[in-house]
């Protein structure tokens, strides 16, 4: 924890076997405006390298993303995401480069607490931004308890965004969601509770 509002995150692992060699690293920087708890943001960068020992193939992947959530008012919440994925791989002698970008936003309105309704829109681009796929959906949610929410929704149209969107369903069609909001203070309270027993 860097300060009252800022937190840095880092994780790395490396695995080597007779069949495969894999390394992965994740770096993140999180912000929470603790004075009013109305703004959260997270920037993340992930790197993965895979080298199968027998084939000579390889895969190098980079994913960068930024997420933000803003409680604009008591009833209105807005969140958005920007992400990009770069992939270089060699398979069966052929080398390929892939780059895709994702931008998305969602607004939720609490019309009759604990019920809320939401609208979401997204765009996925590739081939130097020349190719675009769009997505849009509607959602109905209910707060089950403090910081716990369940939802059902329908994406009117959408796309697959492998490796880019970790929390949202982007495929067309119906979906069910469940969310739990927490921070590092939860783990502190669990430790204190365990020590008191």
Regions found by a protein language model. Name each.
Residues 1-197:
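Gram-negative and organellar
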